[in-house]
Every structure is written in structure tokens, then in C-alpha cells.
Amino acid sequence: MPKPCPNSTVSSHFGLNRESSALAPSSGYLIVEANGGLNQQRSAICNAVAVAGLLNAVLVIPRFEFHAIWKDSSNFGDIYDEDHFISSLEGYVKIVRDVPDEIMTRFSYNVSSIPTIRVQAWATVNYYNGEVYPVLKEHGVIRITPFANRLAMSVPPYIQLLRCIANYKALKFSSPISTLAEKLVDRMVEKSSATGGKYVSVHLRFEEDMVAFSCCLYEGGRAEKSEMDVIRQKSWKGKFKRRDRVIRPDLNRVNGKCPLTPLEVGMMLRGMGFDNNTSIYLASGRIYQPEKHLAPLQEMFPRLYTKESLATPEELAPFQGYSSRMAALDYTVSLLSEVFVTTQGGNFPHFLMGHRRFLFGGHAKTVIPDKPKLVLLLQDMEMRWEVFKKEMKLMLGESDRKGVMVPRVRKINRKTSIYTYPLPECECIFHLSSNFSNTGNILSLGALHPSSNLISSARL
């Protein structure tokens, strides 16, 4: 059973009384601007809550920056339930929707006139206390932008506690998102009757922009190379044409840096033992050249579904053009899957793996392929299927070990983020007050728990 949060963590460091939810007088208002996609913004929000607690500041509901890549103009309230966010953090960090008029009048109601601080990446607690706090006390309000990765992973336990509460209790998806997500989960369970309602989710990063960014080639010859060059220039300007930038698609592939194709994912899963009765939810944006690349995966796994195939056009219409809202649907359906398969790095799989570890006490089945090894195996045209299956079984065993691993003694760093490895630091929040009786953005779990076996003898 998880240990309760120490009394000193709550009372001494936050100066609060949970009976009255009273906090000590604040040192000012904190405004942050979160950039990136859904989970980079999620990271920024959790870090903002932690920084506000550290500085004893009032946090203004974070603003979301519009990015040319993500093309999503959503505000905080479009993605998350603002009321739930505010009430869940009551007594820990005060949250407001706007800076009060008496302060904004000093800056002619112009947010850009508020003192702006450019905080270094992975800033320490000492940095915030020495460099940021004095400015906040002097002006009563500060703005930090950008705010991606602006707080070190290694912080005192009472700051980690705030990250845990923000991530797993306070951030609940908005009603439109959670309502449709619940329908999608129900439909996946219904379509997975052959496996007792259990399904596999695959996060497939084979969208056009991801293929372009990876600088990898996929048998498309000169036409594909020219197409990718145009996309890179349009989206990232001259980033890939700098003199010090050497593009080596062959080395990228051997080093496991290329996104796996749908065919490669299918071969891997069949080799691991997932048969053609397995229901698969594909969490992805629009696949690059879908007619060409999705067909092999569909043939190997006829029970292949996406949010587009599970929802009606009318249900998806309010989400079209909003990549973060679409990603939130994928996140929730993947969160409740029996097995989660990640095929590329990024914030989505790291946050999702952490969330599943938190929900299921560290025991969440995950497939994390050894991509350099997988590439070598797939390139061996003389390898027999039985040999390939044996190698995939070994890879699956290693993935399962990593998936259920709960590091007890470890040094927290960027690679062992609390968002990916939330235990044991976040374990105690199960014992906080009744304010936290539900799990925020989690739907009713019902019988969905990563325990039963979906793997059988695969036959191609």
C-alpha cells in the first residue's frame, strides 16, 4: 500500500490548512506561455504549477502559443476543464483566470508590457529563488516565455508533489473531449469481443511532417527526397540547410532514428505473437501516403481502427483542424489499452507510459522496440520467419521488463523524468483528501487493466 504524503510536505512547505484551504499571502502573479503539442504543453502546465508553489505565486491559467507546425489555436479551456483544474489545486497553489484589473492598469492592460523573464532551460530551484523571485516581489507579476522545460527534473519532494497533483489529478480533459473519448473507448471494447474487450494501442509516428523531420528515405527515390526537402524548408526554414548539418538517411536508419513504417510495425507485432484477431487502435495523425503504407498493416491486422473509423464525421467535426484535441482522443484511448506500443520517441509516449504506470501501480504492458536491432533483422532477407519470431519474443520480453519497471533507487534526470517514471514520488497522492477521489482525466476503468494475455502464436 502506498505511503501517505508526509505532513511536513504539505503543511510546512505550503503553509496551508487543508480544512480552510488557506495559503500564505502570495508574492505575486505568474504568467507562463506553453508551446508545442499536447504533451509538451502538459509538461509546461505541470512545471508552472510547481514553479508557482516554489515562488508562492498565484498562477494565471497558462496561455497556449500558436505554432506553425501544430496549427492548433486551442486555449486551455478547450483542452482541459478549467474549473476542475482550479478546484483540484485549491490549498496547494492558487489559480486564477486573469490578472486583477488593479495590476493590469499599471501595464495599460498590455500583457507584453509585463516584466518578461527568459528562464534558462532546466532551471534549478536556486535559480528561481535567486533570479526570478526578486523580480516577482518587486513588480507583483511576471511573465515567463517560452516555458518548455524550464524547471529541472531534480527538485525537492514538495515540488515534485505539485507536479504529481497537477498531472494526475488536476488536468482533466474538457467535456467535449472526454465525452467523445469515452465513446471511442466503448467502441474499441465492443469491437474487441474476441479478446475479452482488450485491445492494443499503437502510437505510429509516420505522418508527413515526422518523415520529413527525420531526414529518412522510404524507397520513394528522388521524387520522395524532393518532396521532403520542400516540406522541411516550408516548416523549418533553413534549419536543415546549415553548413554544419549533415543529412545521412542511411546512418539515421541504422541508428534507429527513422520512424517505423506501418509494415515494419506489423511485422514486429506478428513476430511477437499478436495474431490477426488482435484489435489495434492506431494513435496517429494522417499517415504519409496512407494508401501505400497502411495496406500491409491492415492486411496483417484486419481489426485495425482509428478515431476516424470509430467516430462519425459529425462527431469529429468540432475536432478537425485542432491537432491537440485530436491527440487528446488518441491519448485517452491509448491510456486504457491492454498493451501500448511506442514506435518513436517524443512527449506523447513518455507521458502516456508514465500515466499508465501511475494508474496500474507500475504494471503496464508496453512494447518499446529496440529499433537499431529491429532494422538489422528486417534488412536480413535470408532470415527465416521462425528465427525472426524468436528474436521478436526476446525483444518483447525486454520491453515488458521496461514497461513494468518501477525504479526505486535512481537519480532523477531528463531521461528518467517524473512524467515517465512517476513512482514512487507520485504514489502518495492516492491518500490525499477527497478532493482527489477521482483520477482527473481518466474514464471509468471497468475491467480494463493490463493483465490478461493478448499474445498468441502468430501466423502470417
UniProtKB/Swiss-Prot annotation:
Look up the EC number in the record and give it.
2.4.1.-
Q: Which domain of life is it from?
A: Eukaryota
Q: Which GO terms describe its molecular function?
A: glycosyltransferase activity
Q: Which residues are glycosylated?
A: N7, N110, N276, N277, N435
Instruction: Please state the pathway this protein functions in, per its UniProt record.
Output: Glycan metabolism
Alphabetical keyword list: Carbohydrate metabolism, Fucose metabolism, Glycoprotein, Glycosyltransferase, Transferase
Listed binding positions for substrate are H203, L204, R205
Task: Write down the top EC class of this protein.
Answer: transferase
**Pfam families this protein is in?**
O-FucT
- GO terms under biological process: fucose metabolic process
* InterPro entries registered for this protein in UniProt: FucosylTrfase_pln, GDP-Fuc_O-FucTrfase
Keyword flag Transmembrane helix: no
Keyword Glycosyltransferase assigned to the entry: answer is yes
Name the protein family: Belongs to the glycosyltransferase GT106 family.
What protein name applies here? O-fucosyltransferase 10
The gene designation is: OFUT10
